[in-house]
């Protein structure tokens, strides 16, 4: 059994995947924005209960590595590393934009051509990457202002919802799905990473540095 979760967006998504049956056993998403630290553990327990298993039945973990806000990413990655250590099972990281791309390309409403994934990077910017019609990444991810990346190509992800003038051809999904994160790992459909955060810029909250010298 593979447990997958992503905390790179304002919502937490968790899924349980049975590789033997090639199917999603259970999936849940948080109902409230943010509060990742309060919501992730209960969602994991709910998914395990839905699947009728306990943690010791897990054989692997999958976690979204971003890019995304520092606080949310840290919650998911620390949880993944801790569980993997305690249970002595492997943990695989996947770029959260790749997860969105796989569902856009291979899900129930496939884009059918090259497309872009744009997610909210705050500060009126987006995380952006381009993909082929099978969801394979061609370029990126980068952090850019929407106006600088405006395109008529299909755009999956929350960026198309937030900036429709720059990305008028919005496609689903808007957010990454833990079910597709699990499929990405189980089927080796995306590049696998260590469970370390994918940052494209410094976190908003940074430790103060040494005082600057003054003449």
Q: Predicted regions span which residues?
A:
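DPxDG-like acidic metal-binding loop motif
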Residues: 60-90, 96
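Oxyanion-binding and handling regions
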Residues: 1-24, 31-38, 92-215
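Short, well-ordered amphipathic alpha-helical segments that serve as non-catalytic structural scaffolds
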Residues: 36-51, 97
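N-terminal, well-ordered alpha-helical segments
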Residues: 38, 42-45, 77, 81, ...
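Short, well-ordered turn and helix-capping elements at secondary-structure junctions
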Residues: 29-32, 44, 67
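Phosphate/pyrophosphate-binding loops at sites that engage ATP/ADP/AMP, CoA/4′-phosphopantetheine
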Residues: 44-60, 108, 150-153
């Amino acid at each position: 059994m593979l447990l997958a979760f992503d905390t790179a967006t304002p919502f937490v998504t968790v899924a349980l995947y049975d590789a033997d049956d090639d199917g999603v056993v259970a999936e849940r998403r948080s109902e409230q924005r943010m509060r990742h630290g309060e919501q992730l553990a209960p969602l994991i327990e709910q998914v395990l209960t839905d699947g009728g298993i306990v943690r010791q039945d897990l054989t692997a973990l999958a976690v979204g590595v971003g890019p995304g806000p520092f606080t949310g990413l840290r919650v998911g990655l620390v949880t993944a590393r801790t569980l993997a250590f305690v249970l002595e099972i492997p943990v695989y990281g996947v770029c959260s934009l790749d997860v969105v791309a796989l569902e856009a390309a291979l899900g129930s409403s496939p884009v059918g051509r090259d497309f872009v994934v744009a997610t909210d990077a705050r500060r009126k910017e987006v995380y952006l990457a381009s993909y082929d019609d099978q969801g394979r990444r061609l370029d990126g991810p980068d952090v850019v202002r929407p106006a600088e990346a405006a395109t008529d190509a299909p755009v999956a992800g929350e960026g198309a919802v937030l900036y429709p003038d720059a990305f008028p051809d919005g496609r689903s999904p808007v957010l990454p799905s833990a079910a597709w994160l699990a499929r990405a790992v189980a089927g080796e459909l995306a590049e696998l990473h260590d469970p370390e955060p994918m940052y494209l810029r410094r976190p908003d909250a940074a430790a103060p540095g040494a005082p600057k010298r003054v003449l």
